[in-house]
A protein has these predicted regions:
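Basic/aromatic-rich interaction segments and small domains that mediate binding to polyanionic partners
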Residues: 2-54
């Protein structure tokens, strides 16, 4: 899977909307590190979860 995110992108996790808006911090292969406003830093496997850019 090609990851179409860049550091600074604002995203939401559609399966965890209560996490709030997140900002992409880094991308390493398929792992996207996002700092969400309600739960802090999470590492997302982009092969399993498609984040939605806002």
């Amino acid at each position: 899977m090609f990851v179409e995110y860049e550091p600074g992108d604002k995203v939401i996790n559609p399966s965890k909307k209560d996490w709030g808006i997140g900002q992409v911090q880094s991308i390493i292969k398929y792992k996207v590190t996002v700092n969400f406003e309600n739960v802090g830093k999470k590492v997302i496997n982009a092969n399993l979860i498609e984040l939605i850019k806002i």
